[in-house]
A protein has these predicted regions:
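Catalytic/RNA-binding core of pseudouridine synthases
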Residues: 1-149
């Protein structure tokens, strides 16, 4: 299939353990595109569909409403980790009131609609001064976390 000169949008599945850039690089090399970009970043441990643009269409991302997203997740109660996910060692919490945790989760999720302000976790791909936050975290360097819409 000859696609290298085509400008278009694609929905591609990003598997667990790949970075968003890994997916773009693979797609670009496989079909010999001049330029490939993505509309947002998924964590390496996340999997799902990503909107990918090729060639001239990469410039159109500025005009795409990127606010309507749906997330599915699985939660593991009774553990905590330095990275707030399963990428670092899980430490079991002595005791947990599952009913109150489910109520907390319900309250938290109900507030995640519309335009919201968030402070990203230190282990995230958000950039501060051109550097990903997780790199500051791995180097144990303090950095001010940005508030984002």
């Amino acid at each position: 299939m000859k696609l290298e000169n085509q400008s278009d949008f694609y929905l591609l599945y990003k598997p667990n353990s790949w970075t968003s850039q890994d997916l773009c690089t693979f797609f670009k090399k496989k079909y010999k595109f001049q330029k490939v970009g993505h509309s947002g970043t998924l964590d390496p441990s996340a999997e799902g569909l990503m909107l990918i643009a090729t060639n001239k269409y990469t410039k159109l991302f500025d005009y795409i409403d990127n606010t309507h997203k749906t997330y599915e997740f699985e939660a593991l109660f009774g553990f905590e980790s330095a990275t707030n996910d399963t990428d670092s060692e899980l430490v079991e919490i002595e005791s947990i009131n599952l009913e109150s945790k489910l109520e907390e989760l319900d309250k938290g999720i109900s507030g995640l609609t519309g335009n919201i302000k968030q402070v990203p976790p230190i282990y995230s791909a958000v950039k501060v001064k051109g550097k990903r936050l997780y790199k500051y975290a791995r180097q144990e360097k303090e950095v001010e976390l940005p508030i984002r819409d």
